[in-house]
Amino acid sequence: MKFVSFNINGLRARPHQLEAIVEKHQPDVIGLQETKVHDDMFPLEEVAKLGYNVFYHGQKGHYGVALLTKETPIAVRRGFPGDDEEAQRRIIMAEIPSLLGNVTVINGYFPQGESRDHPIKFPAKAQFYQNLQNYLETELKRDNPVLIMGDMNISPTDLDIGIGEENRKRWLRTGKCSFLPEEREWMDRLMSWGLVDTFRHANPQTADRFSWFDYRSKGFDDNRGLRIDLLLASQPLAECCVETGIDYEIRSMEKPSDHAPVWATFRR
């Protein structure tokens, strides 16, 4: 069973990248983030013709997530319990039948946070991680197959930082988000529920693979970026992970997203 997570940075701007992902990877499940399209305007017909059940949770111009599944899900949930109409459309979940059992897939576009001293964005990021933590602890069991995927906007370890030592120190000094100590605490707490970072587990020493590259500084040309797009699997699912990677080929296409797709394959 193959999962692909991709921050598409505008679904209607990049159908060519989604088509390329389907053709190359033939995934069973695709999680898209930052679709940037209101539900009323979602290009359902165009996406469904790729051979998927399509579920989406979006708003005009910002944020937005979608799940594409080969198998028909048992259940789909949009947003966290307690989200109101004003909540940013950042998370969609599904329970999907498979040979691995019913897999709970949580696809999220996590807040970026901007910087420690931002009065709105940083607390919103902390709250989002707390909401996910609460959901795991109250709604799910760690001995069941669970996969959290998406643009999580945190680099879990220093191996996941590829912007140069000078920039790394400056970001920490100025409180810029992505690998602040507080953010690492949120991530560690999430992982301690019983999750495995599939890429890092398979590549414990790799320090030159990233998933986000800044457009402005042409970071992709020099492989300067951050690994912030993750697939986190519960232990029973992680034990079935046979392959995982970051697709630089898709990132190198014309008019690309600033993110590369990340993927993992599981077999019983």
Curated annotation (Swiss-Prot):
Question: What domain of life does the native source organism fall in?
Answer: Bacteria
Q: Where is this site: Interaction with DNA substrate?
A: H259
EC number(s): the record gives 3.1.11.2
Q: Which GO terms describe its molecular function?
A: DNA binding; double-stranded DNA 3'-5' DNA exonuclease activity; endonuclease activity; exonuclease activity; metal ion binding
Query: Which parts form a coiled-coil structure per UniProt?
Result: none
Q: Which residues bind Mg(2+) 1?
A: E34, D258
Its required cofactor(s), as named, are:
Mg(2+); Mn(2+)
Q: Which reaction does it catalyse?
A: Exonucleolytic cleavage in the 3'- to 5'-direction to yield nucleoside 5'-phosphates
Q: Where is this site: Transition state stabilizer?
A: N153
Q: Name one Pfam family in it.
A: Exo_endo_phos
Q: How is the cofactor bound?
A: Probably binds two magnesium or manganese ions per subunit.
Where along the chain is Mg(2+) 2 bound? D151, N153
Catalytic residues in the record: Y109, D151 (proton donor/acceptor)
Its subunit composition reads: Monomer.
* Family (UniProt): Belongs to the DNA repair enzymes AP/ExoA family.
What task does this protein carry out?
A: Major apurinic-apyrimidinic endonuclease of E.coli. It removes the damaged DNA at cytosines and guanines by cleaving on the 3'-side of the AP site by a beta-elimination reaction. It exhibits 3'-5'-exonuclease, 3'-phosphomonoesterase, 3'-repair diesterase and ribonuclease H activities.
**What is this protein identified as?**
Exodeoxyribonuclease III
